[in-house]
């Protein structure tokens, strides 16, 4: 039985190379089954112990670009977001840049007074022309298969409820919208709860007509890793 090589992840940790994970990653970006499997087989033949995940995905991107350029661009952007870690702060700063490019005034890691306690939100944004004020909680994951779940949505909703309940006359920073942002995806339960309870979501593939990828492309704001 062939032993799979050990590769070096972006955060410096080691793991066994899994061709199936590469196939899934390519498919999530829109690659057809045959193309994803063919690329994974080609790369598997070249990977040796000590190869970095960055080298693997750069090779995958080069091969995917030959198959379909739009899919390759989507794949490259998603990988770049995954490599912003290991902490969530670079992702918070990136999303702040995206909102600024869309015309918002943004403050990161701001403390907002609630009815019961004060809350530090990952970013606070105001749009004077639209007279809108929002606060956002960001969840960064460096695993493309990890989804932000119902538990997170419930937690975020409770924080926003406390902020909304604060009397406007004493509120240190008024908001009228609460947002949960992730660089990956949401579980179906998290989406159902958010749509019912009024929590706005923004993720790689949600909402369908205004995804994080779409907004990055329109604003021409891209992560640098």
Which residue stretches match the model-derived regions?
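Compact, charge-rich alpha-helical regulatory domains located at protein termini
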Residues: 216-225
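Catalytic cores of nucleic-acid endonucleases
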Residues: 138-206
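Short, charged, surface-exposed secondary-structure boundary motifs
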Residues: 146-147, 209-217
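Acidic-basic catalytic patches of nuclease active cores, encompassing PD-(D/E)XK
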Residues: 77-113
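Long, C-terminal-biased catalytic regions of enzyme "large/alpha" subunits
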Residues: 1-86, 91
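Short, mixed charged/polar active-site loops
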Residues: 14, 118, 131-133
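Active-site metal-binding core of divalent-cation-utilizing nuclease and nuclease-like domains
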Residues: 103-129
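Conserved catalytic cores of phosphodiester-cleaving nucleases, focusing on short active-site segments
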Residues: 99, 121-125, 132-143, 154-157
């Amino acid at each position: 039985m062939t032993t799979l090589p050990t590769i070096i992840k972006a955060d410096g940790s080691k793991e066994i190379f899994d061709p199936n994970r590469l196939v899934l990653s390519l498919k999530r970006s829109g690659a057809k089954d045959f193309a994803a499997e063919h690329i994974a087989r080609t790369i598997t033949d070249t990977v040796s112990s000590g190869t970095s995940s960055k080298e693997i995905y750069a090779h995958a991107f080069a091969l995917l670009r030959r198959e379909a350029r739009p899919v390759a661009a989507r794949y490259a952007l998603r990988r770049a977001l995954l490599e912003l870690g290991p902490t969530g702060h670079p992702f918070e700063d990136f999303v702040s840049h995206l909102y600024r490019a869309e015309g918002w005034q943004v403050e990161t890691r701001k403390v907002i007074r609630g009815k019961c306690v004060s809350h530090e939100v990952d970013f606070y944004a105001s749009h004077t022309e639209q007279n809108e004020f929002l606060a956002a909680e960001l969840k960064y994951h460096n695993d493309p298969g990890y989804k932000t779940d119902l538990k997170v949505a419930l937690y975020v909703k409770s924080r926003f409820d406390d902020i909304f309940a604060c009397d406007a006359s004493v509120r240190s920073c008024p908001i009228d919208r609460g947002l949960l942002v992730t660089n990956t995806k949401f579980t179906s339960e998290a989406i159902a709860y958010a749509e019912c309870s009024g929590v706005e979501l923004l993720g790689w593939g949600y909402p369908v007509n205004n995804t994080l990828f779409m907004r990055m492309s329109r604003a021409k704001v891209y992560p640098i890793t």
